[in-house]
Each structure stands twice: as structure tokens, then as C-alpha cells.
């Protein structure tokens, strides 16, 4: 820490201590399995947290950006002793934002910072067990297992008693990638193991009548994270416990992808009434996390009102303890079909793009925006080409360019979907006619030229209306919920009725945003509202529509939503940590450089981690790892195994690429063939 961070050493405990008081709150959702929620700080709000990498200046920046608490990495005793002075400096400048000390491997450091911090975060996977060695340990008897828990109690109890005495709060924060060898031996690398790891520490707290703590269950995989929190809430409910939850998707990455993964995981839980504090973990400057945090917080705070508008129902077909995607049938080819209809949806998740006649008429730019490759001016499907297009307005019969685009897309298997009324007025050959479910009848006539039906649900249909709509044997259903209605709960209601009827109709989540909605809001809302359903296996694709928005951006966001929900991989997956006091290189710069050179490898996951303290454990899902090993030096991993140590920063990216090649996962970037004039 710099001199400016550690000046004026005379803070007293009274000056620096701001005890956090927990105020439980009754749940507002009666229809979900997880039936309680809580709020922190005597206010009915969801608090936002952010961790800076250099204390005083960045704490101020985070507080000014709206952070309601700030987490600081405390690596050792030197930093711990400086924290008293940092706190005093902040108070002198009028900043009373609570500070959280992030502790790993260091019980003595935790004891010291309890003197001046308002909250201590401990990781059950490494607080008493030391650094992960990824060794398989077999416990022959229960006594051996219990002996380790008794040793943990011996190490952890002094901190519990000190926090209780001083009114300091605690976060028991489990991470999917850093479970102890003991936990792994009995529960495996599972959400159940994450919950039990936290409960071991919680039982010690409760034994000493200390209840001023919160839980977190973080993972870089949103599906694992959501399942772990739901399981935690379920187990607490059975025990009669009501402790707050801190939500976060760890190592989410940067930019749109980081925001998308965070909104899928955090948003899914907030919309179910779970969560009290949140943190969006981005590989960006800490204060930039506040805007997506605020958007998620606001979604969570209005979730109650939106959910009240959904009719009550008894949900069936969704098990939060395990993941199983709802079974659906892709379109089948008929003998008399003039074009191939089998690819208008994708088995791993479909993307539909809403387009206009003007976009169709632009031809080559339109094909590129749709994700198609070009060969001599003709579109070809690529790995991230939209599977179907949706036309609210159909081009005029004399619009030669627009109609030519439709024909060319159909020739490469891209579907064309349009409202039944529009097709009745202006037919399109081989189109899919979309009809509102409330108007659908099994004997209704198909518009001229159309060859398949789609039905559109708004979430307010009766069971009879849903049954009647399915008599059309639609190839897909679109769910476009009514405004100010919870998409999550209205869609669950539709899926419940579909399950009762045994329907395997593919379902597309259709989200429509106002023209003036900013990009960040589109990402956050689509991730929370549709991602929460996809994480439960409810849905077969997405369509994000926004008048006037860039088609390429909406398509890219849609594919990002599918990849973040662990459905369809169309690009390289990155697991990258945010900067903290332990970071040994410029994370933002290095992550950008690696992304630039490796972003064309779908199915490959690369972790970029700032240090070896947490890095190897938190990158559990990655195929390759780039980890700070020492100042100026990088360690490279394949899976969880370090294969190269002490590589210079300057050559480490080249070495990483060579490692990917050596393991048979590299492909060269494709060079698009330019159109040739006739």
C-alpha cells in the first residue's frame, strides 16, 4: 500500500466500527418452492457491494458510484495493520461506507482486521485448510472426517467470538472452485458440497450464539451458482434458519459477457425473492460494477409487484435440486416441403432475429449482421447465424432486394416467421405463421404460402386456451409476456400447462425492449428474465427485439445469453477475475489481449486469473489457465494442472496459444471471402 493509503494512525475501535444489523423479511412469493427472503441493514433494499484493488482512493470512487459496502483484499499482517489508518482517513473525509475484509488462508489476519472492519469474509474452503492441492483424500472412518471439523472449530472459534464481541458481521462465502479436500471427498464438486461447506462454519457460529452472518455460494457457472443458492435456501428453510444471502457469479469476466453471466445468475435468484446483497464481478475498474449492480437491484426490488400480476398456479415439472432441460421436438421435414425446415431451430438453443424490410433490402450488410458468411455475395450459415428471422412487417411484393434476401435465407435453412395477419395480407412462400394463442383454433385456415404454425403466448392464457392453441401442432411457441408482468413466473405458468398436456413444442423467449433502452439494460434484463428460465431448462431459444437497435448487437447478445445459460457455445468462454490487491499483472489489458487472439475458439474455456491464491481453485471449469505466479511471471495450466511456471509476461500469451495448439484445441481464424462483382 502507498503512503497516501496509510496515513494518520490513530483510529479507535469506536471510530471505525459500524456493526451491521440483520433484519429478516417475509417472502413475497407464495408459489415458489423457496419461500423466504431477507434484507440487510434495517432497510427494505438490496445492498450493492464492490471490491477495489487500491484501498483509499478506490473505496471513495466506489462509494461515490453508489456502493453500499466495499470489500478490500487483505493479504497479510502488513495490510491488516494499515487498514485501521485507511478507515480513519475515510471517516475524516466523511465516508462511512462499511468495509469488508476479504480473507483467505489467514486466521491471524482476520483477527487483526476485526478490530477495524465492519464485516469479515471467510472462505470455508481455505480459511483453515490452506491452499488447494487438488489431491484426492479418502477418509476411512467418520471419526477421521469429524476430527478435521473439530480442528476447524478450534481455528475458527476465536474469530467468531471476536466478531460477536465487537458487533462485526461476517460472510461465510463458499466458492465452487475452492472446496476443501474434505468436502470433495464426501460430496464431490457439487452444490450440495458448497452448502455443507458453509454449514460447517455456520454451526460453529450458532454454537456460540453468533448470528450476525450472511451466506454466499459463488461459482463461475451460473447454473451451478443458482442451484447452490436455491439448495442453500431450501436447507435453511427446513432448519428454520433465516440468514441473508450475498449473491454473485464469481470471475464473470468483462464487458457484455461478464454482465450477461452475472445477470443470469443473480437475476434468476432476485426475481424469486432470494438475495440481500449483490456484487457483479467484472474484469473492469471496480466502480464500473455499480451500474449493472444497480440495474439488477432495481429488477429485484420490483419483482414482487410484477409477480403479483401472475395468476396463482401449482407448479410442476421443475426440480431446483438438479438440472434437466425440458424435452422438445425440433421441426420435422414433410415430403411435400419445398425447402428444408429442419434447421429453423437448433437443438442446443435457437436465436431468432426480428428484422425489417429495410434491413432485408441492404443484402450483404444484412447477411453479415445476421451472422452469415459471404461467398461471392451469397450468404452461408455459420456457427452463430440466426436460425430464423421474424417479420412484423412484410416487404412489398415489388421490393426485389428484400424478397431476394428472404429466398436466399430460406435456401440455407433459415426460417421465416411472421404474424398470421401480416401473412394473410402479403403472403410469403414457406413461412411460419405466428398466431396469438387466444385466437388459435385447431381448424383455422393457414395463410396462403405458409407451411407451419407458431403460437404466441403472453402468459395470461387459461389452461383451455393453451390446450386449444396446441391443436394447431405448432413447430414453436413464442412467449412474449405482457408489460409489468413477471416473465419468470408467467412463463413458469405456461410451462406448467405445457407439461400437464405432455407438449414437446419448442419454446422461444421473445423479449421486446423500448427503442430508448440502453444496451446495458437490455443485457441485464434479458439475462435475468430469460436466463433464469433457461437455467431451469425451460426454453429452447431467445429472440431479443428492440426498434432501431443494431441487428448484429441483438443477435450477439442473444447468443451470449444462450452461452451464459450453458446451452449453445458459439465463442470462446472466458473465466477472468476482477482486480484485487493480490493481482500480479494488468488484468484488463491482458484479458483483452488474450480475447483478441483466442476469441474464435467455441467450446474452449480459458481462465485469466490474477494470482495463485485463488486462481487455480476458482477456474474449475476452464480448459486452460493463465495465472499470475509471481510479479512479472505467469503460470500456465491445462485444467487444474500447472504445466509451465515462471513465464515472462511478455511471452506468456504466445506460450498460451502454443499450449492450446499442443492440446489439439486450436483452429486458425477463417478469412471471409469477399464478394466478387459479376
Language-model segments: residues:
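Beta-strand/loop-dominated core regions that host nucleotide or nucleotide-derived cofactor-binding catalytic loops
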Residues: 402-403, 631-637, 641-666
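N-terminal amphipathic alpha-helix/helix-capping segment at the start of soluble metabolic enzymes
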Residues: 1-45, 160, 164-166, 302-365, ...
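Radical SAM enzyme core and accessory elements
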Residues: 370-382, 625, 632, 636, ...
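Glycine-rich phosphate-binding active-site loops on the catalytic face of alpha/beta enzymes
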Residues: 66-69, 117-133, 271-287, 477, ...
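Active-site beta->alpha loop and helix N-cap motifs at the rims of alpha/beta catalytic domains
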Residues: 5, 12, 24, 52-53, ...
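Catalytic alpha/beta core domains of metabolic enzymes, predominantly
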Residues: 138-152, 156, 182-342, 430, ...
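C-terminal accessory/binding modules appended to enzymatic or scaffolding proteins
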Residues: 341-369, 377, 586-631
Amino acid at each position: 500500500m502507498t503512503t497516501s493509503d496509510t496515513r494518520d494512525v490513530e483510529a479507535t475501535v469506536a471510530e471505525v466500527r459500524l456493526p451491521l444489523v440483520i433484519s429478516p423479511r417475509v417472502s413475497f412469493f407464495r408459489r415458489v418452492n423457496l419461500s423466504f427472503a431477507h434484507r440487510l441493514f434495517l432497510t427494505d433494499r438490496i445492498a450493492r457491494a464492490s471490491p477495489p484493488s487500491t484501498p483509499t482512493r478506490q473505496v471513495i470512487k466506489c462509494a461515490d458510484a453508489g456502493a453500499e459496502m466495499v470489500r478490500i483484499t487483505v493479504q497479510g499482517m502488513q495490510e491488516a495493520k494499515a487498514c485501521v489508518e485507511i478507515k480513519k482517513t475515510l471517516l475524516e473525509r466523511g465516508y462511512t461506507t462499511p468495509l469488508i475484509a476479504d480473507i483467505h488462508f489467514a486466521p491471524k489476519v482476520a483477527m487483526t482486521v476485526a478490530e477495524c472492519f465492519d464485516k469479515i469474509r471467510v472462505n470455508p474452503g481455505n480459511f483453515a485448510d490452506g491452499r488447494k492441492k487438488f489431491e484426492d483424500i479418502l477418509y476411512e472412518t467418520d471419526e477421521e472426517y469429524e476430527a478435521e471439523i473439530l480442528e476447524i472449530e478450534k481455528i475458527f472459534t476465536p474469530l467468531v467470538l471476536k466478531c460477536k464481541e465487537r458487533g462485526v458481521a461476517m460472510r461465510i462465502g463458499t466458492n465452487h472452485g475452492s472446496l476443501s479436500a474434505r468436502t470433495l471427498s464426501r460430496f464431490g464438486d457439487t452444490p450440495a458440497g458448497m452448502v455443507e461447506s458453509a454449514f460447517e462454519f455456520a454451526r460453529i457460529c450458532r454454537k456460540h450464539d453468533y448470528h450476525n452472518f450472511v451466506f454466499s455460494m459463488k461459482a463461475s457457472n451460473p447454473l451451478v451458482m443458482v442451484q447452490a443458492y436455491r439448495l442453500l435456501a431450501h436447507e435453511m428453510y427446513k432448519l428454520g434458519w433465516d440468514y441473508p444471502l450475498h449473491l454473485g457469479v464469481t470471475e464473470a469476466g468483462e464487458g457484455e459477457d461478464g454482465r450477461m453471466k452475472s445477470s443470469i445468475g443473480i437475476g434468476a435468484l432476485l426475481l424469486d425473492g432470494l438475495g440481500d446483497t449483490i456484487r457483479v464481478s467484472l474484469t473492469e475498474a471496480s466502480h464500473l460494477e455499480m451500474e449493472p449492480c444497480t440495474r439488477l437491484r432495481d429488477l429485484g426490488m420490483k419483482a414482487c409487484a410484477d409477480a403479483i400480476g401472475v395468476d396463482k398456479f401449482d407448479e410442476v415439472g421443475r426440480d431446483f435440486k438438479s438440472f434437466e432441460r425440458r424435452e422438445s421436438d425440433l421441426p420435422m421435414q414433410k415430403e411435400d416441403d419445398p425447402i428444408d425446415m429442419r434447421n429453423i431451430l437448433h437443438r442446443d438453443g435457437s436465436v431468432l432475429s426480428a428484422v425489417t424490410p429495410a434491413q432485408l433490402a441492404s443484402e450483404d450488410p444484412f447477411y453479415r449482421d445476421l451472422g452469415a458468411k459471404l461467398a461471392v455475395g451469397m450468404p452461408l450459415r455459420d456457427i452463430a447465424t440466426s436460425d430464423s428471422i421474424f417479420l412484423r412487417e412484410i416487404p412489398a411484393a415489388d421490393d426485389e432486394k428484400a424478397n431476394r434476401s428472404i429466398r436466399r435465407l430460406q435456401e440455407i435453412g433459415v426460417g421465416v416467421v411472421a404474424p398470421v395477419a401480416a401473412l394473410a395480407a402479403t403472403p410469403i412462400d414457406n413461412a411460419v405463421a405466428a398466431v396469438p394463442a387466444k385466437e388459435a383454433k385447431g381448424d383455422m385456415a393457414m395463410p396462403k404460402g405458409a407451411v407451419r404454425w407458431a403460437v404466441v403466448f403472453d402468459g395470461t392464457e387459461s389452461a383451455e386456451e393453451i390446450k386449444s392453441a396446441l391443436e394447431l401442432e405448432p413447430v414453436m411457441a413464442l412467449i412474449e409476456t405482457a408489460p409489468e408482468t413477471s416473465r419468470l413466473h408467467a412463463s413458469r405458468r405456461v410451462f406448467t400447462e405445457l407439461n400437464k398436456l405432455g407438449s414437446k413444442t419448442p419454446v422461444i423467449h421473445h423479449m421486446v425492449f423500448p427503442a430508448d433502452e440502453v444496451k446495458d439494460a437490455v443485457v441485464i434484463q434479458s439475462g435475468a428474465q430469460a436466463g433464469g428460465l433457461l437455467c431451469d431448462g425451460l426454453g429452447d431459444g431467445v429472440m431479443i427485439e428492440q426498434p432501431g437497435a443494431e441487428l448484429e448487437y441483438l443477435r450477439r447478445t442473444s447468443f451470449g445469453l444462450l452461452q451464459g445459460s450453458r446451452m449453445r457455445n458459439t465463442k470462446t468462454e472466458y473465466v477472468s477475475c476482477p482486480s484485487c490487491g493480490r493481482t500480479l499483472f494488468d488484468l484488463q489489458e491482458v484479458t483483452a489481449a488474450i480475447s483478441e487472439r483466442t476469441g474464435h475458439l467455441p467450446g474452449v474455456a480459458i481462465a485469466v486469473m490474477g494470482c495463485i491464491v485463488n486462481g487455480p481453485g476458482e477456474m474449475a471449469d476452464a480448459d486452460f489457465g493463465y495465472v499470475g505466479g509471481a510479479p512479472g511471471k505467469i503460470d500456465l495450466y491445462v485444467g487444474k494442472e500447472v504445466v509451465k511456471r515462471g513465464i515472462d509476461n511478455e511471452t506468456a500469451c504466445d506460450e498460451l496459444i502454443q499450449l492450446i495448439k499442443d492440446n489439439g484445441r486450436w483452429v486458425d481464424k477463417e478469412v471471409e471471402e469477399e464478394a466478387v462483382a459479376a
